Amino acid sequence: MTAEELKKRTLQFGVDVALFCKIIYPDPLLKAYANQLIRASSSVGANYRAACRAKSAKDFINKLKIVEEECDECMFFLELIKELKPDSGKSVEPIWKEANEILSIIVESLSTARRNEQSKKS
């Protein structure tokens, strides 16, 4: 997957989460979680874009670590919403799956970037 494709994918992830949260937002119990989920999901795309513009390998790795954390946070809030509102399961599953796939890509990218950084030092 190219950087441009992943930029589009993380943007779409943010859109999908926002549309999902629009549906669950009227539930007073879930409002705070929906707001946090929107912030975290938009941060995934924003920080990935920032990583693509990193000024150094160290900067790139640090920004990708933020993406990793935010993506994991999205998964946590999706799981929490699913537990609190079990009927949201069908809506949560594809978004959670996408978050997990993005997280896997980011974790692998981090591993590669760290290996490349180590090989430069050797």
Give the location of each predicted region.
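Short, C-terminally biased terminal segments at protein or domain edges
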Residues: M1-S122
